[in-house]
Amino acid sequence: MKKYSLLIALLLPLLIFGQQESYYSLYRYNMNVINPAYAGAEAANMLSLTSRRQWASMDDAPSTVAMSFSSARENNVGLGISVVSDNVFIEQQTFAYVDFSYKLDMGESQLYLGLKGGGNFYKADPSSLSSYTGGDPTQVALSSFNPNIGAGAYYSASSFWVSFSIPRLFNSKRDGDLVVTAKDRVHSYVGGGAYIGIGNGLTVKPSLMLRKVKGLPITTDLTGMVSWQNSFDVGVSVVNFPLTIA
């Protein structure tokens, strides 16, 4: 059965922080991008394609394209793949990972444990700058590949789910040949949601995802969805809302 989803994202930039890792307001449809344990958690094969663009009227504005696929295999094994491409002005990052999960059957619920492996292709090309001269040694193109691994756990029951993951376990430098260079820092995700039946084939699906990066407040994604016959979803998401815990 085909499943259609509509999500209206309300972006509330109460505080502005540098965001190194793509954040997904549709994380329920890109779950194995941030949590490898989700690979194979659904009975059917899952393919997701999403695109996001900020400041659409500006040339070379930030944009993200994400693709994920996961499949339940034999012997409680799940496999998946995810590719995310981020473009921000002269910078391009492509994250490519393979996911593996194993299901522990706990009667009326399931616990999935997962690992992911892959890496980040990074490129910065100053030749697209209007001020580019071609002879300036400070305007050389940069490129690098940083391998990494990630891990996660996903618990699923008939009325709720809980997720914890660190999709990239190690900090990595954008360009290892430079003394001073930007770093991609470790991101931790904790989330959960519920399924609340209200009759007439309708189910309410509230969920919350928290993200933590060292040196920054916890950021949140609060989503409310209504599903009809488990085939059509509509909802609202409030994203990038900073949360500080003393």
Annotated model-derived regions:
Residues 1-23, 224:
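Bacterial Sec-dependent N-terminal signal peptides
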Residues 19-246:
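Subset of outer-membrane beta-barrel
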